[in-house]
Curated annotation (Swiss-Prot):
Cofactor(s) of this protein: (R)-lipoate
UniProt EC number: 2.3.1.12
Function, in words: The pyruvate dehydrogenase complex catalyzes the overall conversion of pyruvate to acetyl-CoA and CO(2). It contains multiple copies of three enzymatic components: pyruvate dehydrogenase (E1), dihydrolipoamide acetyltransferase (E2) and lipoamide dehydrogenase (E3).
Domain Lipoyl-binding positions: 2-78
Pfam family, one: Biotin_lipoyl
Keywords carried by this UniProt record: Acyltransferase, Lipoyl, Transferase
Domain Peripheral subunit-binding (PSBD): 132-169
SUPFAM superfamilies documented for this protein: CoA-dependent acyltransferases, Peripheral subunit-binding domain of 2-oxo acid dehydrogenase complex, Single hybrid motif
GO molecular function: dihydrolipoyllysine-residue acetyltransferase activity
The protein's name in its UniProt record: Dihydrolipoyllysine-residue acetyltransferase component of pyruvate dehydrogenase complex
Amino acid sequence: MPIKILMPVLSPTMTEGNLARWLKKEGDKVNPGEVIAEIETDKATMEVEAVDEGILAKIVIPQNSQNVPVNSLIAVLSEEGEEKTDIDAFIAKNNNVSPSPKTDANLPKPHENIAKVEEQVAVIKHDASKIFASPLAKRLAKMGNIRLESVKGSGPHGRIVKQDILSYTPSTVHNKIVSRNPEEYRLVPNNNIRKIIAKRLLESKQTVPHFYLSIECNVDKLLDIREDINKSFSEDKSTRISVNDFIILAVAKALQELPNANASWGEDAIRYHNNVDISVAVAIENGLVTPIVKNANQKNIIELSREMKELIKKAKDNKLTPEEFQGGGFTISNLGMYGIKNFNAIINPPQSCIMGVGASAKRAIVKNDQVTIATIMDVTLSADHRVVDGAVGAEFLAAFKKFIESPALMLI
């Protein structure tokens, strides 16, 4: 009897996904545990393993298909000797989804519009000189200060077309071509990750009452301790500590002291998290993901750094599992490496807080009534006022500042 292969549910919020690639073809033998396809979810590309043994009799949904509903039929396994008519009847009975191939065939293409203009426009007669030119060629000639009389047309009946203008070489230095790309834009279809980011962030800005608190942190002591640790492990690059590792640990320790900031909004109740699980924003080629450092308050700086390096690598390779990016009680977004001084990040619902971290820079400060130089880092907390009151947010930032400016406290 034929066996269904269904579009898997890879996360609690997943309702549809993109079937990125088939790793088996029709007629191939399939064994339990073999990877047969790759599914693109809102956060990563996941591998699909076969559960049953059989022959891949029919691929119902081709690769590069978008928006395939979960639990819909994507392929059929058969046993040896089953007839094709039985397979076709089985598919007709169980299939209720039409594939939506990932294609830009229906998107308007600017160069096609240009071609149509050149092919369909009527030939225009210019006074007694009888110069024939397409409207596009005339526009380009005007932009480049080119006299049409000096251009030889290569189109039908000597008609001047776009390419004649673009390839024209002036006879004097006074005639100069200004080449402009006639295609004003290019269209890139939104992938699943970009659609989810757009949906969730729009929902956040429209429904979550954000408020923002900022604070400056002196990171001179932190930079000194970081240098000492990295010198101690100079031969082992996997143990090199980043400033962001210290920031994650400082947030974890601050949340341990201020558990009211480690919370999520619900219509009927606020959820206060017993575990300190911190989401860290990581930029990838197709958008943004937030892998989670779980129980961050229980890890030392070396353990946390190694785990974060592994999560970043998996994120950039699209290899994160759902357990590694779903959940979390607090998010960190660090744009300091781009030279950004400060910014207001958008909360990731249902979380109630996200902290934006800016670049560290030397500034003049007053200490003991004396002007001195210190390395200062700006951080801004975005908080959901339904969950976190202003005083709680301020107390959290004060605790974070304490750990950053006295890093030995979080290494004990």
